[in-house]
Amino acid sequence: MRTLLDLDPKGKRVLVRVDYNVPVQDGKVQDETRILESLPTLRHLLAGGASLVLLSHLGRPKGPDPRYSLAPVGEALRAHLPEARFAPFPPGSEEARREAEALRPGEVLLLENVRFEPGEEKNDPELSARYARLGEAFVLDAFGSAHRAHASVVGVARLLPAYAGFLMEKEVRALSRLLKDPERPYAVVLGGAKVSDKIGVIESLLPRIDRLLIGGAMAFTFLKALGGEVGKSLVEEDRLDLAKDLLGRAEALGVRVYLPEDVVAAERIEAGVETRVFPARAIPVPYMGLDIGPKTREAFARALEGARTVFWNGPMGVFEVPPFDEGTLAVGRAIAALEGAFTVVGGGDSVAAVNRLGLKDRFGHVSTGGGASLEFLEKGTLPGLEVLEG
């Protein structure tokens, strides 16, 4: 993989694909983590004498939509990088090209949301060529988007000398440790809503791991596959056989699987609703399981004891609605308390839990990519990485 150390930026206009897909509310950025993570790459290039053109997406607009403008991101970036300014032009436009060509060394230009361009997600070759006119070299530092074969990730990288930024390199180095000779015992904690989102990563990791802890709504598909009564809990009915098969494979490989013993349940998902705790395999209708229960939190903490490598992706419950965030926070605390282990967390809610607990420094690596980290662990590569090799 070509990295920043292979690029001499002096006097060059460098096009950088960053991941500024951050939460914005009332025109203000709510979490600057991804902006801060991009700064080492940007500062390195500026110190080397480059001018920079930045590309990013924000949300999933269906074309130009002021609610998804990068203007608030430009404001937040400027607070950390005074050289930066936002230009409200779609990156494939003539105006964007003129703005880019007028840049002097040391200047930074953030263009409008790449997803305002109709060809971005189709990896349109013509749009990729228009992006390529914005710079003389391309740096991919958007790990969170590296699993998407889009024009600003893959298309433009084929048309310019392309390099991995520092964040990209850091992510690949950390996640590779989870695949190549990880220190044992190795525990994986998976949560979130759907088994279908995690099948690939479970199949890839099963031969490498010792313990698999499953929480979140996806646990109910496994519990029902084992004959449990799960009330109105979310179940993927078309994945019951697959869940049973995965449990059988885990057993054959000697992997110990931990499923919830009890759950916090309610009749509907809303803050302050009346809750009950039930055994995970005996949830009565009309209740649905919305978080792992107190016994499960203790059991999961015990299951993590002594682990030397841990990967965690996905919340243990409906994290955004208290009190169903307790299980996720408990798992975050248990992993952070491990001494001498290499611990990696990825995925929006899991990372949000770690940040809320103020325990980011207690993790070996906090990944900026949820879907990207899962796909990397499943396949060992990503579309955005493949174009940087050679």
Swiss-Prot record:
- What's a GO biological-process term for it? glycolytic process
Task: Enumerate the Gene3D superfamilies for this protein.
Answer: Phosphoglycerate kinase, N-terminal domain (3.40.50.1260)
* Major place of residence: cytoplasm
GO molecular function ontology, one term from the record: ATP binding
Q: Where in the cell is it found?
A: Cytoplasm
Q: Name one Pfam family in it.
A: PGK
Residues binding ATP are K198, G289, E320, G347, G348, D349, S350
Q: How does this polypeptide assemble, per the annotation?
A: Monomer.
Q: What's this protein's name?
A: Phosphoglycerate kinase
Record the organism. Answer: Thermus thermophilus (strain ATCC BAA-163 / DSM 7039 / HB27)
| Encoding gene, per UniProt annotation | pgk
